[in-house]
Amino acid sequence: MKFSSVLKQSAKYAAHVPKSGVFPRGFQVGSIASGVKKNGNLDLGVLVNTNKSYESSAASVFTTNKFKAAPVILSQRVLEEKNGKGINAIVVNSGCANSVTGEVGLQDATQMAKLIDEKLGATSPSTLIMSTGVIGQRLQMDKISKGVSQLFANNSFGSDFNSWLNIAKSICTTDTFPKLITSNFTLKNGTQYTLTGMAKGAGMICPNMATLLGFIVTDLPIESKALSKMLKFATDRSFNCISVDGDMSTNDTINMIANGAVKTDEITEDSPEFLQVRDQVTQFAQKLAQLVVRDGEGATKFVTVKVQNSSTFADAKIIAESISNSMLVKTALYGKDANWGRILCAIGYAKLDNLDSLQTDKLNVSFVATDNSEPRELKLLVNGVPQLNIDEERASQILALPDLEVLVDLGTGNEEAQFWTCDLSHEYVTINGDYRS
């Protein structure tokens, strides 16, 4: 199954792709089919900050995979050298990951960024790089260079809806729909601002950054250290709380740029608006991350795993992750099998920081319907005791829903965490069995 047909035929496209939007001031985006992708789809995108009245701030969260791709290594260097200030562009390609490509890969990534810097007249490196696609293949820099030249020569940049939608399309690989969201927010002091985000990912998705590329931009002025803290907090509760298949990629990157086009006081960690913006960014990032799971390769279900009343947030998250990554749980969900023993097993082998977080005689596990049908909650385990007379018909009804929740109550504290995952189907094997072709 080829991506070109997947994108056109996807029923998810109509359900999750916006038809309009308002975008942050002071940004322009462009995209082009450079030829890196064999199918002729858009595969090169550039985002540019055009606001010169404020020195932009940038922050990133990168993969923890030991085999970091060249664009990850180079972007980390640029951010460190610039202390998160003066980053004015992001260039991204799909079709080739430029990963495990050695010194020549770093040279290609450097050249890719330099192409943009030169077009913008930058006197020092100010471009972040992102790549996604097949690992171990060298980037076709002749095509990238020609594509960049055409983008700028034809002035193929815009701030309209179609321009933003097309750059979201340009980063897709096995995705069945481009992931683009934009929202307006109002601070308590009356300041209005906008967040726009896009992401790609449908497979090789597992926390601590998987095959997941994304960026969020805003027209708020945010100090670089405050922005970094916001993004880390948001990522820990969004992009690091999703799982499709448990595989961690070499390229994951989430970038965020604040260009200060909104005329208001710069937000720092000490600003009264800091927590409000941080929480708004977190909720926004969660919506964007959830789209990745909804587009999980071959997925038929979107599943929220909620772990509540834990002694710590960390342990609640560890348990939610363990359940979300379990292949046996995911296949049971696909088969509509109310096999709660698999959930219990995944809870039991979770590598907790604090063993007191899990006490078997306080544990409760339920399936929860999300369509407002009753009974909404079907209890499977109560205070460690299995419910022997489970309504199997009701269980089948809940498990047949496209959206459902697995609820775990530890009864040992007041902290909670959520993970978002999907089922594992035959189609996942089909997609990944011929990915390179």
UniProtKB/Swiss-Prot annotation:
UniProt site positions, description: Cleavage: 210-211
Active site, UniProt feature: 211 (nucleophile)
GO MF annotation, one: glutamate N-acetyltransferase activity
A GO term from the CC aspect: mitochondrial matrix
This protein's UniProt keywords: Acyltransferase, Amino-acid biosynthesis, Arginine biosynthesis, Autocatalytic cleavage, Mitochondrion, Multifunctional enzyme, Transferase
Pathway this chain belongs to: Amino-acid biosynthesis; L-arginine biosynthesis; L-ornithine and N-acetyl-L-glutamate from L-glutamate and N(2)-acetyl-L-ornithine (cyclic): step 1/1; Amino-acid biosynthesis; L-arginine biosynthesis; N(2)-acetyl-L-ornithine from L-glutamate: step 1/4
Location of the protein in the cell: Mitochondrion matrix
Catalysed reaction, written as an equation: N(2)-acetyl-L-ornithine + L-glutamate = N-acetyl-L-glutamate + L-ornithine; L-glutamate + acetyl-CoA = N-acetyl-L-glutamate + CoA + H(+)
UniProt cross-references to Pfam families, sorted A to Z: ArgJ
InterPro entries: Arg_biosynth_ArgJ, ArgJ-like_dom_sf, ArgJ_beta_C
Assigned EC number: 2.3.1.35, 2.3.1.1
Site feature location: Involved in the stabilization of negative charge on the oxyanion by the formation of the oxyanion hole: 132-133
Misc. remarks from the entry: This protein may be expected to contain an N-terminal transit peptide but none has been predicted.
Family: Belongs to the ArgJ family.
HAMAP family: ArgJ
Name of the protein this chain belongs to: Arginine biosynthesis bifunctional protein ArgJ, mitochondrial
